[in-house]
Design a protein with these regions (language model features):
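N-terminal signal peptide c-region/cleavage motif recognized by signal peptidases
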Residues: 26-30
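Short beta-strand->loop
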Residues: 126-133, 191-196, 213, 223-259, ...
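Hinge/capping helix and adjacent helix->loop/strand transition within the periplasmic-binding protein
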Residues: 65, 92-98, 113-202, 251, ...
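An extracytoplasmic/periplasmic, membrane-proximal ligand-sensing/linker region
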Residues: 39-41, 186-190, 250, 274-334
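Beta->alpha turn/N-cap motifs
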Residues: 102-107, 170, 199-200, 217-222, ...
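Bacterial N-terminal signal peptides that target proteins for export
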Residues: 2-19
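N-terminal (or domain-start) structured segment
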Residues: 33-127, 165, 173, 189-214, ...
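A ligand-binding cleft/hinge motif common to bilobed small-molecule-binding domains
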Residues: 106-117, 178, 182-187, 214-246
Length: 334
C-alpha cells in the first residue's frame, strides 16, 4: 500500500512542486480574470422603486456605461426600508465588480437610522467602496396646483396656525424627503406630519392623488409635473436658485438655514480588487462625459456633479457626519 501511494503521489519534492504549480495557476487565473474584467453583464442595484432619483440616474447611465465597458449593464430595482435592503444586498455581494449600488444620500445615514430605531443595521458604510458621484440636487418643495399656498411663507403660516394638521409624503423614514422637510420644520419651528411611502416615485403619486398636502422631490422627479401645471414649486433647498426654476426662491432667501442636497453615486462591495475598481472608475468617467449622458442629465434637469472615488468618499463622509446629527435629532419614530 505504501509503495502504491508513493507511486501515485511521488516524492515530497514532487508533491511540493505540483502544489506550487496549482497555486501559481490559480493566482495567474485570478489575475487574468481581473485583467479581462468585465467578462459578463454588470448589475446596477437601485435600492428604490422606479421613478425616483436613483432610478433616473441609473437608467441614464446604463447605456453609455455599457458602451464604455463593452458589456451589458442591467438596472435592477430592489426597494425596501428606504434603500437599506438594496444597499445591504450590494454590501454583502461577491466583491468581483459585477454588482454595483446606485445609492442616494440616505446611504450614509441608514445604518445610524436603524440604530436610532432600536434595530441592528443591515450594513455599515465601510462595507461599500465608493466609485463615483454622479449628481447632487437640491430638493424642490411642492404642492398641487389647486393648493391654497402659493409661497413658502403661506405654508409655514398655515402650519403655525394649525400645528400638526399638514401632512407630507416621503420616500420612507430618514430618507432624503423626510430629512429635508424636517430640517426646514426645525428651522421654521413648525410641526408637519410625515406619511412614508416606499420611494420617491410613490411619494410623488401620493401628492398628485391628493393623499397628502405637500412633499419635496429631486428636480428630475418633479420637472414633468411642474411643466404640466399639476404641481406648484414653493422653494428649493439649495444655496442658489435652479436654472430650470429661476422664479422659485431658496429656503435661505426665506430666512431658513436648511440646505439639503440629494446626491446619487455608485458603490461596489468592499474588498473588490483594485484593478477591477480602476476599470469601473475609468469606464464611469468615460460614460458620464459622453454626449448621451450629459444631454440626458440636462434634459431631466439633474445637476451633474461628477467626482471620482477619493473626492466622492470625502464628500459622502462629510455629508454623513452632518446628516447623522439630523437623524439623531429626529430620534426614534413610533
Amino acid at each position: 500500500m505504501k509503495t502504491m501511494l508513493s507511486r501515485l503521489m511521488g516524492s515530497p519534492q514532487q508533491l511540493a512542486l505540483i502544489c506550487g504549480s496549482v497555486l501559481l495557476m490559480t493566482a495567474t487565473g485570478a489575475a487574468l480574470a481581473q485583467d479581462q474584467f468585465p467578462t459578463g453583464p454588470i448589475s446596477i442595484i437601485v435600492p428604490n422603486p422606479p421613478g425616483g432619483a436613483s432610478d433616473i440616474n441609473a437608467r441614464l447611465l446604463a447605456e453609455p456605461w455599457s458602451n464604455a465597458l463593452k458589456q451589458t449593464v442591467l438596472v435592477l430595482n430592489k426597494p425596501g426600508m428606504g434603500g437599506a435592503i438594496g444597499a445591504a444586498q450590494v454590501a454583502k455581494a461577491k466583491p468581483d465588480g459585477y454588482t454595483i449600488l446606485m445609492a442616494l444620500s440616505s446611504v450614509v445615514v441608514a445604518p445610524e437610522a436603524e440604530r436610532v430605531s432600536g434595530r441592528k443595521a443591515l450594513y455599515e458604510l465601510d462595507q461599500l467602496e465608493p466609485i463615483a458621484l454622479l449628481s447632487s440636487d437640491p430638493m424642490v418643495m411642492l404642492v398641487r396646483s389647486d393648493s391654497p399656498w402659493h409661497t413658502l411663507a403661506d405654508l409655514i403660516k398655515a402650519a403655525k396656525d394649525k400645528p400638526g394638521t399638514i401632512n407630507y409624503s416621503s420616500s420612507g423614514n430618514f430618507g432624503p424627503i423626510h430629512l429635508s422637510v424636517e430640517m426646514l420644520a426645525h428651522q421654521a419651528d413648525i410641526k408637519l406630519v410625515q406619511v412614508p411611502f416606499g420611494g420617491g416615485g410613490p411619494s410623488m403619486l401620493a401628492l398628485l392623488g391628493g393623499q397628502v398636502a405637500m412633499t419635496t422631490a429631486a428636480p428630475a422627479v418633479a420637472a414633468a409635473q411642474i411643466s404640466a401645471g399639476k404641481l406648484r414649486p414653493l422653494a428649493v433647498s439649495g444655496a442658489k436658485r435652479l436654472a430650470m426654476l429661476p422664479d422659485v426662491p431658496t429656503y435661505q432667501e426665506a430666512g431658513y438655514d436648511a440646505q439639503y442636497h440629494i446626491w446619487a453615486g455608485l458603490y461596489a462591495p468592499a474588498g473588490t480588487p483594485k484593478a477591477v475598481l480602476q476599470t469601473l472608475r475609468e469606464s464611469v468617467n468615460k460614460a458620464v462625459h459622453s454626449p448621451q449622458f450629459t444631454k440626458g442629465m440636462e434634459k431631466q434637469g439633474i445637476i451633474f456633479d461628477y467626482r471620482d472615488a477619493p473626492e466622492f468618499k470625502k464628500f459622502a463622509t462629510e455629508d454623513g457626519v452632518r446628516m447623522v446629527k439630523v437623524v439623531r435629532a429626529i430620534g426614534k419614530i413610533d
